[in-house]
A protein has these predicted regions:
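N-terminal accessory targeting/assembly segments
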Residues: 1-118
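Helix-rich effector regions associated with P-loop NTPase G domains
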Residues: 52-69, 79-99, 134-135, 142, ...
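Short beta-strands and strand-loop turn motifs
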Residues: 107-110, 135-139
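Conserved ATPase-coupling elements of RecA-like P-loop NTPase cores
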Residues: 117-119, 146-152, 252-255
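Histidine-anchored nucleotide/phosphate-binding helix
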Residues: 119-130
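Canonical P-loop GTPase G-domain recognition
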Residues: 134, 141-196
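Conserved active-site beta-strand-loop modules that form the wall/rim of enzyme catalytic pockets
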Residues: 187-189, 195, 199-203, 232-233, ...
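A conserved segment at the C-terminal end of the G1
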Residues: 198-214
Length: 346
């Protein structure tokens, strides 16, 4: 069979072989796949993912498959990822939800209406930095905000060193600046709350209006509505790819890793100086670098408190994950012992 698609054009750096595909969409238990032979669908091979020793695929993943030219292919393995954006799944089960994988830029989208919240962006930046890709902040609906330049400056305070762009898909304002990220073979992921204009932004980047868009143009309306119902990867005319994701009502912290320090470089710079005592709680101890920075105005007290809140949330998440792993190992040990006893006929 001759190849009709070069997976290198879809960001794959390895050898293009018949058993490699990229996940283009996630529909519950069925996956859209880009293969060397064209677009198809696939499902997880029974048993391949049951033991939990490899991650379930998400949009943007490269996977190994058993290609079926006459029907759905079988996905047998998720290949190593170069970047991953994940969050805590909503609900009581405390599971990681992989949102997107193998991307170069995270476009954090928020609108210049009532959704505008630089403080909330710090949470998104923490997770984005930890993903392994470069975050970019996009402020949509700039045509509805006469003082959008001041909003850019306000956002830059909460996101030191991160590019911030104000755009309008209706007037074209700022759209050219996004072209530097949409280069051939690069993958971008769009993340943000419901109704901030991700689908409209994607349509503008793609030069078409294929996505269903629910208008939230009313400047007095702050309630966003989901216009994307599943995660999907779309090829642009520029040769770049965009992973669109459903709007997020909340972004639960799964693992901040080094992302917290990267999102708060001003705080990290103060902490790097070191306090007199290694176990300093940064409260009233003598020789505390943080207290000194707070008192001389170098460090903003509110920003320090938000850093502490995210740090505490991440610590609780780590502790819960460790406890869950311990329980899983315990249950696995019991299952193995029962299996051994059954084998011996006891």
């Amino acid at each position: 069979m001759n190849y009709s698609i070069d997976l290198a054009d879809y960001g794959y750096n390895g050898e293009c072989t018949p058993d490699v595909a990229r996940v283009s969409a996630v529909h519950k238990e069925r996956y859209g796949l880009i293969t060397p032979f064209g677009m198809t669908y696939g499902f997880l091979k029974p048993g391949s993912y049951m033991l939990g020793d490899q991650p379930y695929p998400t949009a943007g993943d490269f996977v190994r498959i058993e290609f079926n030219p006459s029907g759905d292919s079988r996905i047998i393995e998720t290949l190593p990822r170069r970047s991953l954006f994940s969050r805590m799944e909503a609900g009581p089960l405390m599971r990681e939800q992989a949102v997107a994988a193998n991307f170069d830029y995270v476009l954090l989208v928020t609108s210049l209406n009532h959704d505008f919240n630089p403080r909330r962006m710090e949470r998104y930046l923490t997770v984005a930095f930890n993903s392994g890709a470069s975050p970019v902040i996009v402020l949509t609906k700039a045509d509805l905000c006469p003082d959008y330049q001041s909003k850019i400056a306000e956002m830059e305070i909460s996101a030191p060193g991160v590019p911030v762009h104000a755009v309008s898909v209706y007037t074209g304002l700022g759209m050219d600046a996004l072209g530097q990220y949409a280069r051939p073979r690069a993958t971008l992921v769009l993340l943000g709350s419901s109704g901030v204009g991700k689908s409209s932004l994607l349509n503008a980047l793609a030069g078409s209006y294929e996505m269903r868009v629910n208008s939230t143009r009313d400047v007095d309306s702050s309630k966003g509505r989901h216009t994307t119902t599943h995660r999907q990867l779309i090829m642009l005319d520029s040769g770049a790819m965009v992973i669109d994701t459903p709007g997020m009502r909340e972004l639960g912290m799964w693992c901040a890793g080094d992302g917290l320090d990267a999102a708060f470089p001003d705080v990290e710079a103060v902490l790097a100086r070191g306090c007199r005592f290694s176990n300093c709680r940064h409260e009233s101890e003598p020789g505390c670098a943080v207290r000194a920075a707070l008192e001389n105005g170098e460090l903003d007290p509110e920003r320090w408190r938000r850093y502490q809140a995210l740090q505490a949330e991440n610590r609780r998440s780590d502790e819960r994950q460790a406890l869950k792993r311990e329980r899983q190992e315990h249950m696995k040990g019991i299952a193995m012992k029962r299996k051994e006893l059954k084998r011996k006929g006891r």
